[in-house]
Design a protein with these regions (language model features):
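Conserved GNAT acetyl-CoA-binding A-motif
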Residues: 93-105, 222-232
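Flexible loop/N-cap segments at domain edges
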Residues: 186-191, 197-232
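Conserved acetyl-CoA-binding loop-helix of GNAT-fold acetyltransferases
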Residues: 73, 79-92, 113, 207-219, ...
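Active-site/acyl-donor-binding loops of N-acyltransferases
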Residues: 103, 114-133, 203, 227-277
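Amide-forming acyltransferase catalytic core, primarily the GNAT-like/NAT-type
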Residues: 116-198, 208-209
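A short, well-structured alpha-helix characteristic of acyl/acetyltransferase catalytic modules
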Residues: 1-3, 12-22, 133-135, 147-156, ...
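Active-site rim helix/loop that mediates acceptor-substrate recognition in acyltransferases
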Residues: 16, 20-56, 158-178
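Conserved beta-strand in the GNAT
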Residues: 46, 52-60, 65-72, 184-198
């Protein structure tokens, strides 16, 4: 394996334009704004071949847990051990008890070699929903969250996921639309991403409550391209397909190490994104 010709250095905002070219070449939907958002809550490394970025890896700390994400290697630099090297270098930046990631088919062999184990599956759905067919909503069930709600929603998220995501929820409070089930029994987040908007996380006590959250958000985004990543719930995925979304991919979730299982009557129905868990 030959990696000595690549200069691996910390990922800074100056690298976003080069990273954008790399993700676009890989067919990923991220905009420059999406890279900037990820970098604002993460640390990372880039591999340079001269003045060209040929690989990236980010790590996003959430207390005892972290995700490793945006692992991309330029096609011409593959097969030289660069993916493993930049991933390991990025992971050395922080020391959580547990690592999580979402694996593509092409990335899974590398992650398994690094000790990651399969923990579940993700259903990626996207498209334009039909607001006329969405779940019946009572106006008393849901409301838009305010900044005063964010601390409570952060605690709900922590209880459901085991992730301490203070910085992410500060971002949500400023840049996302957040709907909350009255009685604080769940919430959903929608924000700009890629070709349109992404819905996630969605946290609720039941699939019926999750459908209410989705219906509320889908009705507010009629005509807009929407993506969501459902966490292993086939029934919810089928229902979303009935609302007009299309299942386009089914990657797997993987983990290395353990921080213990969260104990809560709240359930995660959709992750924030494949990068952010």
């Amino acid at each position: 394996m030959i990696t000595e010709t690549y200069n691996i250095m910390p990922f800074t905002s100056d690298h976003i334009s080069g990273a954008l070219g790399l993700s676009q070449a890989a067919g990923w939907p991220h905009r420059a704004e999406d890279w900037a958002m990820l970098l604002s809550v993460s640390k990372g490394m880039v591999a340079m071949d001269g003045d060209q970025i040929v690989a990236t890896a980010l790590v996003t700390p959430y207390g005892d847990v972290a995700t490793v994400n945006m692992i991309i290697v330029d096609e011409k630099a593959r097969g030289k051990g660069l993916g493993r090297k930049i991933m390991a270098t990025a992971m050395a930046l922080i020391s959580p008890h547990e690592w999580r990631l979402i694996a593509t088919v092409s990335g899974r062999p590398l992650y398994e070699k690094m000790g990651f184990k399969v923990t579940g599956e993700i259903m990626q759905l996207q498209g334009h929903s039909n607001p006329l067919s969405t779940h019946e909503i009572s106006g008393d069930d849901l409301s838009w969250a305010t900044l005063d709600d964010m601390d409570n929603l952060l605690m709900q998220d922590w209880a459901a996921t085991g992730l301490k995501r203070d910085n992410l929820f500060k971002y949500f409070g400023k840049m996302a639309k957040v709907v909350v089930l009255n009685g604080h029994n769940g919430f959903g987040v929608m924000r700009d991403f890629g070709q349109g908007q992404v819905i996630g996380p969605v946290v609720a006590k039941s699939i019926e409550d999750a459908k209410k959250i989705y219906s509320f958000l889908l009705n507010t985004s009629a005509g807009v391209f929407v993506r969501t990543d459902v966490l292993g719930n086939e029934n919810l995925s089928i229902w979303l397909e009935q609302q007009g979304l299309e299942r386009v991919d089914q990657p797997i979730s993987m983990a290395y190490g353990s921080s213990g299982s969260p104990k809560s009557d709240l359930e995660v129905f959709a992750i924030t994104s494949q990068a952010l868990a």
